Every structure is written in C-alpha cells, then in structure tokens.
Amino acid sequence: MAVALLDDWCKGMDLDPKKAVLIVGIPVQYTEAAINDALKEGLPPLCAYKVIGRMFRREDEAKAVLIELPEVVDYTMMPTHIPAEGGAWEVVVKPRSPDDEFMNKLIYFLRDEGRRIVDVAKALGFSTVPTGKIELKNLDQDKPKGLKSLCNNSTCYKKLKVFSGSPFPGPGEESFETWLEEVTELMQLWQVSEREKKQCLLESLRGSALSIMQALWTSNDSLTVEQCLKALKHIFGNKEDSKVLQFRFLQSSQKPAEKVSDYLLRLEPLLQKAVQQSPLSAHSADSIRLKHVLSQVSMTTGLRGKLSLLDQQGCPPTFLELMKLTRDEEEWESTVVVEEQEQVRRDSSACEAANEVVTQAEDSREVSTQTTGEEMTSVKRRRLLWRHSAGEEGQRKESGFWAESEPDEQKPYVRAQESGNERGAWAVSHPNPKEIEAQDSQEFLPVAGNRDTLTKSWGSPDKGTGDMSVAEGQQGQGKAPNFLLARNDPNKQEQIPHSSVTTKWQDRGECQRLKWGASMITRPQGNPDRSWDTSGSQDGEDGCSELRMPTGTEAAQGVEEPATGLSWAEDTSAWEQARLGRETVPRRGGRRIQPVFRIIYTALGEPHEGSTLESFRE
C-alpha cells in the first residue's frame, strides 16, 4: 500500500518515483519543525532533500511525508527506518528493477568504449532500419534520463584524460606527450562529427591549455581538431633541436640478446622524431632506416643478404615491410633451432643406448671372465689333486706295496723314463740319436745267463735288487746279477727296484734270449714262427742284441691272451721273473723307432709333453 501511495503521489506531483522517498508512521502530534529535525538526524548527511508535502493516513492513524531527492535513490546509503520518539518511522522507496541496473551498466560500458546505441543495433542485425526509426521499448518516465539522452542524442564517447598545460602535472593530470598520444589515437577512431570532437577536446583541457584553445577558436572558427593539436604541440611540445634528435637516432644500438624486430620497434620513434624536425621525405626515412639497420644490427646471413640486395637496388622497404621480413626470418631461425635441439636429443638418446649396450657387454664379459677364472681354478685344482694322487701312487710303487699285494697280471706297468722326456724338455736342444740309442742299449740291456741261473738267483718277483756294482760282482762270480733300471740323468742316478718294473711280452709265437757277450741264442721249442727280429744292434755294445716286439695283428692278439703254442710251460714262471728286469725297444720292420717329442697345448692350462712311444707301450 505504501509503494502504491508513492507512485500515485509522484504522478500527481510530476515527480520521478526513483528520486522520491515516502516516510510513513509519523505521530500526529509532530509539528513540521520536529519532523525536519528528525529527518536531518535520520537521513545520510550528504543527502540533499526537499519536503514536497504532508498528509494524514486513516489506515495508520499517522502522518506521511513525501521527500524529493536531486539524484536517484542510492539503495546502499538509504536507511529503512528513522529513529524518533514514540517509535521508528518507515522509509518507503521505489523497488529496484533488474532492467534498470542492466541499462545503467550498458550506458557506462558504451561510454567507455566510445560506442553508441546505434552501433549496438547494427551489431544485432538492425542495420537496414533507419536510425531515426529505432525505438526502444518502454521508453516512458520510469527509464533513466541518461538513457533517454543517449537514445535521442547519438553522441557517446570515452572521457579523455586531462591536460592543464602546467610543466608539473597535478593529481589526475597527464603530461603533454601522454595526453597528445591518447587524444590523437581516439580522434582517429571516433566516428562522430567535427563539432563533437571539438567539444570532447575542450572538456579534456584545463588552465592555460583551455584558454589558448578558446582563443584559437574565437579567432578562427573553421579550425579542425588536427590543426588545434598541431598548435598545442608547437606551444607545449618538446623544444629539442633536430640535431639532438638525429644524434639520438644515430647513437641507438642493439642490446645484447635483443631480437631485430624488437630493436626496430624501439628505433622507429627516434627516427620519426628526427624526420619531423628535418625536411626529409618518407623515402629518405626508409633509406636511412635500412642503412642504419645494416650497419648497427647483428642478424643472420640470409636476412643480411636480402637487405643488402634491396639497398643495392635502391628499393628500401617501408617499416611494415621490414618488420614482416624480419619476423619471417626469426620464425625460420627458431624452427631450425628447434630441429637442431631435437636432433641433439635423438643423438644423445642413441649414445645412451650405445653406452647401455657397452655396459651390458662389459658386465657379461666380467661374468664370463669370472666363470673362466673359476674353471681355470677347478682345472688347476683337479690337476693338483691328480698330481698328488699320482705322487702317492708312485711312492707306493717304489715301496713295492703294489708289487707285493697284486698278482703279476694286475700289476701296473712302469717304464723307465728316457733322457729329456720330462717337463721342460721342449726347451732343450735334441741330442744325437746315436747317443740316445747307445744309452738305451746300456739302460735296458737284459741280464746275462740262462733260465736256470736266473731262476735260482731271483727266486721270486718280490726280491729286491742291489746297486750296479753288486750286479757286476755277481756276474763275475757266475751268478745272475739283479737287473737295475737306471734313469738317465747326468746329475743323479736313480735306481728303481725290479719289483716295481713290469714288462709285457708277446706270448704268441717264440721268445729268444741272448747271453751277455757270447751272443748265445736260446729258442724255445714250438712253432718256428719268425715274428721276432734276431738281428743284433749295431749301435749298442758288442755282443748285445735287441728284442723286437710284434706289431699289428700279432700285438693286438697277444696283449691279454696267453700263448697257446708255448713249449716250455714248466719254465714260464722263471721266465716271467727274468722279464721283470728287461725293457723292450719297439721296432717296426728293421728300423728302430726313435721317440718323437711333441708339446700338447691344453686350453686354459700348461703345456704337456707326449711321446709316440705311448701308443706302443699301451
């Protein structure tokens, strides 16, 4: 009800409801002076108001007062109640409208952008409609007055900054250079009449600058805005000499790590100032700019070649053309740099992959080296164990343990080692074959005597033997000497008992025995097969002979089976005892076989010696 009363009262008084305030609930006994005092205390201190009228309301049994404000009601500052004696008074205002708030924001926005409502209509697709026929809805009294003026008068512009002409600008003022740059730019953008531009220019001037501009227009009303700005520039502009401006331009240089395009943007204002103070044309300015860039700027070879060609042809590019050419070259250079960085990254990745492969190969090599070392250690360990066992076996053989405990057919066969058939013999020069043959004949010469004397003398295979002197004494006394196997060592003579030496003979066929010195040959009765060579040795001592071992099929058949054609079975044991002290020299045909030494290299081990006699002895 109070809002309806406010609308009716404003219509009767021709007032804007948004600029009016209705106060209800005032007691009847309050006089006009008391009401004014209460309003002064209750309303904001900066709020100017005027009491329009008073009335009595029957519904409330109280008075109502209508107040007019010079501006639209500020809802943030206006209170809702006014405290007084007898109770608070209610303040009634026009309710807010969302459309009004939107229109106010639109007005301020268009003013800041320098646009008009007509421009908004054209942007919305109403360009074909004449400007005079554009009608906005609800253009009645409840719309803001600013909106009406904006719609009726199409002038809308951005408020310019203030210039007073003082050498020291005050608060809210700008220097002449800054103000002139802004005004020149906005005047070129505004699509308004010349009169409106002049009006805006006058609003931005203060002090001495405003007085000078008014005097100019009074003297010549036909002056344009551009002419007025030139006049102000001559009056308030920089008074620098043209030579100083030219010197500044020529002394400008490129900063470290500064792009060519950035330097051109910094150089252009200096060039324009220098040209304005001198009678040079635009073509001369382009030529000066090009020559200065070629002499002062560090650039790529391609860009320098292009600019040098333009300079030689006498066709200097303008500022925009030079900027475009420079930007294109910088973009191409940045692309090349990115590609090079990508290539470097790929190369580094490939190097890392190769390093990983090499590292893996080294790791595997270390593992294989460790494995090989372990294998070598195991091989050496087995070899040492074998040598140790072989040494123990040799000691047992020398002590005669095996010869006493094992039967004759199971005893191991031990041969006397020849001279030079030991470790390291490969490093010694080969001796004379004839000397070797003579030594062999002396070492392995059989004991002289017949079977009876041998049987009586030796008795059993386990009987030990004496030294060489004892054997010679026994021979001189007619006794069968005990046979000694001597190792052909120039420094030491090592005696080997006959109990540890066994030889294997072919029992198939025949066997011959030679006497010492008398060349007496005793042949057993039986098959007269001549598989044995009875020729005496020409290289040995006189009266000595050699026994030839059957080869081929005969040797293969006679290794393990006893001969079935023996005619002296009763003397077999004695004859076997006699053979314990003999060492046969293998022969092939009529030639004596010389031992051939060779070095056998074993992987991851030491060289070993071998002899071709091993195959015959085995």
Swiss-Prot record:
Residues 390-399 have a biased composition (Basic and acidic residues). InterPro entries: PNMA, PNMA_C, PNMA_N. GO terms for biological process: meiosis I. Its main location: nucleus. The keyword Methyltransferase does not apply. It comes from the Eukaryota. Residues 390-409, 451-475, 519-549 are annotated as: Disordered. Restricted to testis, where expression is low. Not detected in the brain. Keywords: Nucleus. It is found in: Nucleus. One of its GO terms (cellular component) is cell cortex. Belongs to the PNMA family. This is Paraneoplastic antigen-like protein 5. It comes from Mus musculus.
